[in-house]
């Protein structure tokens, strides 16, 4: 469809019978209305022309050849209103044959049929709205049970009898044996409804606003009646399931009201017929014909529907049970057309091959949407395997030179001509083919101000496509920061991603303002952080920050393992900023000295050390008792706790505090500190 702003869009949902009829009906100059498919035939076996009122009828779906009717007459297609648009003999419209790609037909069903998607798919929308079990509804739809139709202000046999515990009853128990055939027909037409007609009556009687109010009241009552202190766990679970059902029911009713969809539209009286070009019959070598499975399923529906029409119109003495069985066959044929195999064993052809139904055609990776509509190749796009780029910023991606020079070739040519490195397009292209050094310089300048879009199929939510600032990398793989993988549902085991270049200024502005990866840190569904460390990152952080499990007690009880340094000499090593011995953990005045010692290979990254910290009283716990106290000759003493050390003067004043850590912790802390400072700096610039 096309909205009022001329934007092409696709909307999927329930439609009214009037809308289905409007899609298909055409009025001929003689006043005849065409659009209904009544015959299960396709092409005549002698003339190879479409059968009239069949599945490929030219009157309904348009001419096979542009401007040529079924009689063979030709007329130039013009826009003049005076020219006749229909052939007077065959009724075929003189129009472009491409109309057979979108002109629809319809089948007028002799009985009402439920749409199997709304009945059998989970959750069942019909069962949720009617607040009935799916098993009961299936028995009603497939004519195994009957439904007592309420007759307003009239005494009925079923009401007078008063022996029914449930609204839906079995035929054997609801019909007395003394009814004759004629009496039974009167009784059935007046007081009993079965099949999809019973479902439609109940859906039509629903008031969605009253349904929402009653469901909300029941939900509140269940919340007040909950058992305190989990006295009855089984009842609590039962109440919880009922409350969840009521919430789903309210949301479903809201959706119907918001979209102006009537619940009874989930029961079909008109079945749309797809355009012929979407279910073709083609001729292969040897004169044989290949047909789409949809055609065979449509034929099955028409055959059974015509049989039911004959039973209802020509044979008035037909037993009601036979009519009900035929209605059940029509329901099953429509179910097979819409979703083959949803009720059990799928329908197969003569070669034991399962027929592809409408659901099979549109769903999945090879379906109409993902393969035909979403899987098209477009210009200014590329594709490659993704690999990890841990040194990249969150909003950057590494683009291989081979891909970048092709994607940005137009911008590159313009840059070479503007800076007078090439006088025309031909010379610029030759420089690009030869990959001169100036080409890479211009390419980097072009890429600095141009974001790219990365997409990983399937795009199930909006984080499946995000914007990045590209940089040139060696190799043939796209480099990606590991933290953005969760939004794409990607990993580095061979996944591929597509890269697209937004061309217009509007697209580039939208990419920068809305789609950059560092602005999409929360899940749009539940609001939880989505850029969180996983897998290899968690293992790396664990190894980086893991120290001795026994902590400060390791040296006390394992004196042989207290040599934490690679310097095996026993002599005391002194420096201006730190001191350490073989049997003592080193002391450092700042983190730079600790990292310098690690770079000089004098300590390991997991070696415990004491790092001087600012005088922060929050580190000291008032209830914690020191493990050891070391006194020195000048009167100062060290209070050693599990995670920190306090140096006090003779007056018990705190002179300095050391925390027990290792180089891994220090490196991790510095990375976080630099990231926070960079964020604060960027935020202050924005203000």
UniProtKB/Swiss-Prot annotation:
Binds 1 Mg(2+) ion per subunit. Its EC number is 2.7.7.6. Its cofactor is Mg(2+); Zn(2+). It is found in: Plastid, Chloroplast. One of its GO terms (cellular component) is mitochondrion. The keyword Metal-binding applies. Pfam families: RNA_pol_Rpb1_1, RNA_pol_Rpb1_2. InterPro entries: DNA-dir_RpoC_beta_prime (IPR045867), RNA_pol_asu (IPR000722), RNA_pol_N (IPR006592), RNA_pol_Rpb1_1 (IPR007080), RNA_pol_Rpb1_3_sf (IPR042102), RNA_pol_Rpb1_clamp_domain (IPR044893), RNApol_RpoC1 (IPR034678). It catalyses: RNA(n) + a ribonucleoside 5'-triphosphate = RNA(n+1) + diphosphate. It comes from the Eukaryota. One of its GO terms (biological process) is DNA-templated transcription. Keywords: Chloroplast, DNA-directed RNA polymerase, Magnesium, Metal-binding, Nucleotidyltransferase, Plastid, Transcription, Transferase, Zinc. DNA-dependent RNA polymerase catalyzes the transcription of DNA into RNA using the four ribonucleoside triphosphates as substrates. Belongs to the RNA polymerase beta' chain family. RpoC1 subfamily. In plastids the minimal PEP RNA polymerase catalytic core is composed of four subunits: alpha, beta, beta', and beta''. When a (nuclear-encoded) sigma factor is associated with the core the holoenzyme is formed, which can initiate transcription. This is DNA-directed RNA polymerase subunit beta'. The gene is rpoC1.
């Amino acid at each position: 469809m096309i909205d009022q702003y001329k934007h092409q869009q696709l909307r999927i949902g329930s439609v009214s019978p009037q809308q289905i009829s409007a899609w298909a009906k055409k009025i001929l100059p003689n006043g005849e209305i065409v659009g209904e498919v009544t015959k299960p035939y396709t092409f005549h076996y002698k003339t190879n022309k479409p059968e009239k009122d069949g599945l490929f009828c030219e009157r309904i779906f348009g001419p096979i050849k542009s401007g040529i009717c079924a009689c063979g007459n030709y007329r130039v297609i013009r826009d003049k209103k005076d020219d006749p648009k229909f052939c007077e003999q065959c009724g075929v419209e003189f129009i472009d044959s491409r109309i057979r790609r979108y002109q629809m037909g319809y089948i007028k069903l002799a009985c009402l049929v439920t749409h199997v998607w709304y009945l059998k798919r989970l959750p069942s929308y019909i069962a949720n709205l009617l607040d009935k079990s799916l098993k009961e509804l299936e028995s009603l739809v497939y004519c195994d049970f009957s439904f007592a139709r309420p007759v307003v202000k009239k005494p009925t046999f079923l009401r007078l009898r008063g022996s029914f515990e449930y609204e839906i009853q079995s035929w054997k128990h609801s019909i007395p044996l003394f009814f004759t055939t004629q009496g039974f027909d009167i009784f059935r037409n007046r007081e009993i409804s079965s099949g999809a007609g019973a479902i439609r009556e109940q859906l039509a009687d629903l008031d969605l606003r009253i349904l929402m109010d009653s469901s909300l009241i029941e939900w509140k009552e269940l919340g007040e009646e909950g058992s305190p202190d989990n006295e009855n766990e089984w009842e609590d679970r039962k109440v919880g399931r009922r409350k969840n059902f009521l919430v789903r029911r309210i949301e479903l009713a809201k959706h119907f009201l918001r979209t102006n969809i009537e619940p009874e539209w989930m029961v079909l009286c008109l079945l749309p017929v797809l355009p012929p070009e979407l279910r073709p019959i083609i001729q292969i070598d040897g004169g044989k014909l290949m047909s789409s499975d949809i055609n065979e399923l449509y034929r099955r529906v028409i055959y059974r529907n015509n049989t039911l029409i004959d039973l209802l119109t020509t044979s008035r003495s037909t037993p009601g049970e036979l009519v009900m069985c035929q209605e059940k066959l029509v329901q099953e044929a429509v179910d097979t057309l819409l979703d083959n195999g949803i009720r059990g064993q799928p329908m197969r052809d003569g070669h034991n091959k399962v027929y592809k139904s409408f659901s099979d055609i549109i769903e999945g990776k090879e379906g109409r949407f993902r393969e035909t509509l979403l899987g098209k190749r477009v210009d200014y796009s590329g594709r490659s395997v993704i690999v990890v780029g841990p040194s990249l910023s969150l909003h950057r991606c590494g683009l291989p030179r081979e891909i970048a020079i092709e994607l940005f070739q137009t911008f590159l040519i313009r840059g070479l001509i503007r800076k007078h490195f090439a006088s025309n397009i031909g010379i610029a292209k030759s420089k690009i083919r030869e990959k001169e050094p100036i080409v890479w310089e211009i390419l980097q300048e072009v890429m600095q101000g141009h974001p790219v879009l990365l997409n990983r199929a399937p795009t199930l939510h909006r984080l499946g496509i995000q914007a990045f600032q590209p940089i040139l990398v060696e190799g043939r793989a796209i480099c990606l920061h590991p933290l953005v993988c969760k939004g794409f549902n990607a990993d580095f085991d061979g996944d591929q991603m597509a890269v697209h270049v937004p061309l217009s200024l509007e697209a580039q502005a939208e990419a920068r303002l809305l789609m950059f990866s560092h602005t999409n840190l929360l899940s749009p569904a539940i609001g939880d952080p989505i850029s969180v460390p996983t897998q290899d990152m968690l293992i790396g952080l664990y190894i980086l920050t893991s120290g001795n499990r026994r902590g400060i007690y390791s040296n006390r009880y394992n004196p042989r393992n207290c040599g934490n340094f690679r310097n095996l000499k026993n002599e005391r090593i002194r420096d201006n900023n730190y001191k350490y011995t073989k049997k003592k953990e080193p002391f450092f005045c700042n983190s730079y000295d600790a990292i310098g010692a690690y770079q000089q290979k004098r300590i390991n990254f997991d070696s415990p050390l004491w790092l001087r910290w600012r005088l922060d009283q929050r580190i000291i716990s008032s209830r914690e008792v020191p493990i050891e106290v070391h006194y020195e000759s000048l009167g100062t003493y060290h209070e050693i706790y599990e995670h920190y050390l306090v140096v006090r003067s003779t007056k018990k004043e705190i002179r300095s505090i050391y925390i027990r850590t290792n180089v891994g912790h220090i490196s991790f802390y510095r990375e976080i500190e630099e990231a926070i400072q960079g964020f604060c700096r960027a935020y202050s610039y924005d203000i």
